[in-house]
Amino acid sequence: MYRFIIFFSLLALTASKVSEPEKDDEIAVKIPTKRSVSEPPKDDDIAVKIPMRKKRGIAIHPWQWESHLWPNAEVPYDIASHYTATERGIILSAMEAFRDVTCVRFRPRRSTDKHYLQINKHYQLERCFSYIGRQSSRWLFGTRDGKVETRMKLDPSCLLYNGRGTVMHELMHILGFYHEHQRDDRDRRIGGSASHYNFKIYQRAKSYYMGGYDANSIMHYNFGSVPWQKRDYFSPSDIRNINTLYKCNNRVVSKFPSTIPSTSTTTTKAPQFELFEKKQIESNSLFRRRRS
């Protein structure tokens, strides 16, 4: 009898550790040391390990591609109805940034989509977080209708200042990328606690380093010892990394510049969006980029 009690206690403890990302203002997900279907990759930022020519960035392991990359570079999403029109507009603006320079497409989910991104502010986690890559565990992320949702929490406070950049950062996590400042060749001025999961270094044996360190990446935190930057646009290496990870070279990609800061979205009221359609994006100044 006691053996059964101990067994189920350990099982419950293990489940709570697997399904609950570590706390932080951006996200949490550790890379599992062993291949496990039930254990989602977790951490604040990084990408997948890719056997290709030298690129910049850091990514997840090749064995995770099949289950954690989004097929055909297409991410179905569902944005909770509790967000205001302005908040929803900021989220959609961040999604549109990927369309400009990569083959990745975010679209409203359909009833036939088995996997999709769910954005909600009520998850029992800190402010803003995202899982790394598409989640596939029905045990942890299954819904009542048999679907599997990859969760992103966006508290409204995350959207107040540099909201567009914050959402772009979190969407990079959703695509499979980790933090740039957690590389072993990062700026030596970066300081912090080694016990903090968003400061620790990811070993090259457990993650894929896509070329050299890039302090301008949208996946890089701002630190007091390093010149502060407001990031609401992709660096050239961010663009290369996404296109490499999702094999965009053989697809048509827009040539709009992404290294120029976009128009602020924090003071502009967005219209109510029923569908994420290109014609709506092009007709609304909230989503326009400066192209000169």
From Swiss-Prot:
Residues of the Peptidase M12A domain: 56-249
Disulfide bonds: 103-248, 128-158
GO BP field: proteolysis
TM region positions: none
EC number: 3.4.24.-
The record's free-text note on cofactor binding: Binds 1 zinc ion per subunit.
Annotated compartments: Secreted
Cofactor(s) demanded: Zn(2+)
Protein name stated in the entry: Zinc metalloproteinase nas-3
Gene that produces this protein: nas-3
